Amino acid sequence: MFTWKGAYKMAKIAVVEDNDAMREQLCGFIAQYARESGRQLDVTAFADGAEIVDPYRPGFDIIFLDIEMPTLGGMPTAERIRQVDPDVVLVFVTNMAQYAIRGYEVDAL
C-alpha cells in the first residue's frame, strides 16, 4: 500500500498481458489516471510472465498480471515474484472468477 507524504513519489508499475490490445488499453487507463491525478507513474509493459521474471528485479510498486498467458501464466509468475519481493502489490486482471481464491495464495488483489 502506498503512503503519499508531501511530494508524490513516482510509482513504478508493470503491466503483464499477452494480448496486445488489452495491454495497450490497461496502459492507457494508467496513463489517463496519471494525467487526471497529476501523479508521475513509470509504466513498463511485458507481453508474458516469463519476460518479467527472467530475471525479476524488485523495484515495482504495483504489478498488473493477466492470469492466462502462453509461456508463463499469472499464477506461476506471481509465485516467482513473491519469492524475491514480498512487498510488491500484485493485481490479477482476469474475467475468470475461478482464479480469485488462488490469488489470495500469493497475497494478490
Where are the regions a protein language model picked out?
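Short, Lys/Arg-enriched N-terminal segments with co-localized hydrophobic residues
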Residues: 1-9
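CheY-like receiver
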Residues: 54, 60-109
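Two-component/phosphorelay signaling modules centered on CheY-like receiver
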Residues: 19-44, 83
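Generic structural signal for beta-strand residues in well-ordered domains
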Residues: 6, 36, 55-56, 83
